[in-house]
Amino acid sequence: GLITDISERTGPVELQLENTTYTKASIFMNVFNCHVNRTPTTGTVEEISYKPGKFLNASLDKASDENERNYYKIKCLKSGEEIIMVQIAGLIVRRIVCEVEQGQSLKQGDRVGMIRFGSRVDIFFKNKKVLAKIGQNVVAGESLIASE
């Protein structure tokens, strides 16, 4: 996918995190990219929350708030901090697949699910050094977005 945004933003309202500031990295996947999504950290899935919505072009910023999406709150094993991963459905096929359950332990790079074609993943994190840059192509399970 392609890093389309790295910015400071409040957390998702759907997880009652609107009063917490995070760094958000957005990764847009076009129809030619692999759409398998992998966990950005080793930790435990604390919460999964589905939100129905529209099917706008996932490269648009407003897709984060308006499109169908699935939220994962993952408690990082190493730091104890929460990392939020959001699968955002896109314009074309419009299907989010979740392959994990609440309470499940994950290792960094484990498969979480997939989004079918023309979609996006947003990752919210705190207290990390951002390694990725806007415009950079990244590969799930291989490219580092941020580090301790």
How should these model regions be labeled?
Residues 2-148:
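Contiguous, well-folded functional domains in the mature portion of proteins
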